[in-house]
Amino acid sequence: TRAGLTNIHPERISSEHDSRIARLTGKADRVLVDAPCSGLGTLRRNPDLKYRQSPETVAKLLEQQHSILDAAAKLVKPQGRLVYATCSVLPEENEMQVERFLEEHPEYELLDCAELLAGLKIDLNTGKYLRLDSAKHQTDGFFAAVLRRR
């Protein structure tokens, strides 16, 4: 790879119902959930998006996100990490989704994104969660949480 890493085996799992989940249970060091979301963090580039989302469509997304996170959690081995990311600015899709996950999965803990980034010499000081704001960071709205399996 470009990064010079040779022990990476990416698996694109496009559904929480994928048959490979059973085979990969407890084997992944890192799992990225790029969750389907309302996309409301991209409003500056997609202003019509606000007319395509409704409380009903967001409610469906919330359940899908929950299901995907639940399935992804099974893939991570002890001390492995699960990253949950959206391009939404809605707390329901972000912090609240992660808090619900942590309540249902006591084997996981939330890592502090600001500390992780500081260790890489990136000073965003966003707190426990990585939350990018279009006004403050000159980018789309973005959210990420890093969870570690105990």
Q: Model features per residue range: what roles?
A:
Residues 1-150:
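S-adenosylmethionine
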